[in-house]
């Protein structure tokens, strides 16, 4: 059967576009990573789940993916308008630790979360603090080409030099100029942004000697410099959250156009927010951190399941009822798959339908629904399992695994009693014991290897 064409929604073009890689069977993918001054929350993690699904989809289509992700451990100011203090310095003061300790701690916490959510590790992880010279060199080239100017607090990019600045976000640059109501200090235009910020009179924990003075790089320059180092000055796909469109990605594009004469990525993909009561979730609260969900009795993979029920370009409203429903559905799915026989074959008609769903801009709600269709179909049991596990290469739910739980002693005794009466041929009594176990909140699963017990969903 023919492979359906892979279509991706390109934010720059505002349309679905057939995906064609620069090099045959290889993809360069750059993902904006976390600013490691605090724990990631569920909204942050939704973006990385979307990136994981994208990577898995590319791989199942036969591509070798070079997935590069940055770690912002310096330079991201509290305000995207280049004002306020560095988030790392602020986090260090809050935790009474050094900025370096904060970065190391929260970077590890972030990767722990990725592991719990079964998110693939990037091919390359690059920290901003380990690429200062690359960023300085990038700024110097912009300076040589006349795209920068210096103020008393730093070196800025002159957005007026680019005729199509803001194309990605459809920014009304003239409207911004006319409607500006905030203090611009020495900036020439409201859209100009910092490339290098001076430390000033107060020494910082993170600062470097640059050609313009002691300071630190701006937030946007790190991604342009590191993407070019690891993927070249033009690569296939750049991804991030929808909040990156109007400022961060717009400014990345400006830097690369100014330096190289072209946009750095052929496709721009953006995941939409997770919302709580129709508002964007921020890092200010702790209730939607992954460890908080676990403390409430939810397993991390239930959150992964929940995100698959909504398209990545749709806002997902978070509710505890929704997460509970996702956990129950995940348990039912595992129980259905775990006790199906092995050594089956993937059904080709279902495979083609699944590929059609995922290849049309990662339509995971339809792909997830198809798993249930397969399990409720008339396929041979072993082929149901093989087909569902093929789907799980994209879903990433590890549906062949059943969580190990401690079974209470009185339940274990009932299971043992049921096994004995079955051996004696008293199947009516065995069924009665099964029902008793069911009423107590557990499920007996019989197979050729004996019986196992799981918590009833």
From Swiss-Prot:
The keyword Protein biosynthesis applies. It is found in: Cytoplasm. It catalyses: tRNA(Cys) + L-cysteine + ATP = L-cysteinyl-tRNA(Cys) + AMP + diphosphate. Its cofactor is Zn(2+). GO terms for cellular component: cytosol. Binds 1 zinc ion per subunit. GO terms for biological process: cysteinyl-tRNA aminoacylation. Transmembrane segments: none annotated. Its EC number is 6.1.1.16. Gene3D superfamilies: Anticodon-binding domain of a subclass of class I aminoacyl-tRNA synthetases (1.20.120.640), HUPs (3.40.50.620). Keywords: Aminoacyl-tRNA synthetase, ATP-binding, Cytoplasm, Ligase, Metal-binding, Nucleotide-binding, Protein biosynthesis, Zinc. Zn(2+) binds at residues 32, 223, 248, 252. GO terms for molecular function: ATP binding; cysteine-tRNA ligase activity; zinc ion binding. Belongs to the class-I aminoacyl-tRNA synthetase family. This is Putative cysteine--tRNA ligase 2. The lineage of its organism: Bacteria, Pseudomonadati, Pseudomonadota, Gammaproteobacteria, Vibrionales.
């Amino acid at each position: 059967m023919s492979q359906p064409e892979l279509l991706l929604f390109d934010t720059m073009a505002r349309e679905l576009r057939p995906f064609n890689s620069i090099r045959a069977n290889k993809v360069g993918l750059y993902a904006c990573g976390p600013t490691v001054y605090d724990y990631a929350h569920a909204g942050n993690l939704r973006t990385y789940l979307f990136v994981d699904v994208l990577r898995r989809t590319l791989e199942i289509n036969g591509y070798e993916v070079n997935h590069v992700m940055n770690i912002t451990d310096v330079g991201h100011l509290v305000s995207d308008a280049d004002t306020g203090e560095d988030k790392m310095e602020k986090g260090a003061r809050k935790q009474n630790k050094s900025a370096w300790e904060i970065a190391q701690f929260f970077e590890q916490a972030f990767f722990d979360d990725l592991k719990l959510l079964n998110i693939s590790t990037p091919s390359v992880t690059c920290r901003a603090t380990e690429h200062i010279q690359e960023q300085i060199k990038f700024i110097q080239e912009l300076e040589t080409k006349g795209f920068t100017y210096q103020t008393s607090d730093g070196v800025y990019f002159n957005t007026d030099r680019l005729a199509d600045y803001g194309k990605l976000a459809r920014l009304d640059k003239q409207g911004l100029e006319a409607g500006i109501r905030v203090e611009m200090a020495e900036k020439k235009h409201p859209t100009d942004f910092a490339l290098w910020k001076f430390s000033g009179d107060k020494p910082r924990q993170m600062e470097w000697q640059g050609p313009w003075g002691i300071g630190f790089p701006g937030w946007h320059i790190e991604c342009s410099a590191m993407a070019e180092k690891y993927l070249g000055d033009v690569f296939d796909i750049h991804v991030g959250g929808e909040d990156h469109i109007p400022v961060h990605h717009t400014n990345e594009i400006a830097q690369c156009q100014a330096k190289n004469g072209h946009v750095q990525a052929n496709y721009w993909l953006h995941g939409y927010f997770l919302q709580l009561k129709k508002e964007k979730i921020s890092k200010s609260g702790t209730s939607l951190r992954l460890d908080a969900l676990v403390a409430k009795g939810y397993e991390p993979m239930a959150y992964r399941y929940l995100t698959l029920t909504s398209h990545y370009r749709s806002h997902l409203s978070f509710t505890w009822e929704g997460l509970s429903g996702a956990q129950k559905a995940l348990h039912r799915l595992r129980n259905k798959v775990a006790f199906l026989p092995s050594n089956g074959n993937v059904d080709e008609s279902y495979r083609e339908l699944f590929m059609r769903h995922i290849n049309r801009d990662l339509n995971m709600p339809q792909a997830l629904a198809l798993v249930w269709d397969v399990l409720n179909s008339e396929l041979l049991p072993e082929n149901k399992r093989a087909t569902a596990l093929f789907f799980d290469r994209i879903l990433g739910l590890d549906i062949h695994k059943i969580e190990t739980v401690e079974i209470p002693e009185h339940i274990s005794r009932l299971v043992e009693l049921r096994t004995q009466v079955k051996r004696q041929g008293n199947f009516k009594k065995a069924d009665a014991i099964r029902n008793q176990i069911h009423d107590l909140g557990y499920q007996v699963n019989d197979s050729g290897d004996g019986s196992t017990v799981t918590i009833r969903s």
